Amino acid sequence: MTVYSLTETTGNAGCYGVFSSEEKATAAAMEFIKSWEYENAEETIFDGFHKCIYYGEPDAYGNCGCFEIWKHELDAT
């Protein structure tokens, strides 16, 4: 079974859910970003097991918000 976890690794750090597809995890990330009133989001390309969605304006150190989507293969036994 394949699942995709959605985590935020910066100011709003935490796990935001587990989804059945990368597309559903991406849609959820975009909804969180929109609800936090950020207007910009930039996705990296999903490389088969991971992608990032950056949002917000960079701070003084060049850091902005980041959601990460990770692919997990679970053993059904």
Q: Where are the language model's segments positioned?
A:
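Short aromatic-glycine-(Arg/Gly/Cys) micro-motifs in beta-strand/loop hairpins
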Residues: M1-C15, L74
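A short, charged, amphipathic alpha-helix used as a generic interaction element across diverse proteins
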Residues: E8-T10, S20-E43
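Short, solvent-exposed polar/charged micro-motifs at secondary-structure junctions
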Residues: Y16-G17, G56
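Short, mixed-charge low-complexity intrinsically disordered segments
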Residues: E31-T77
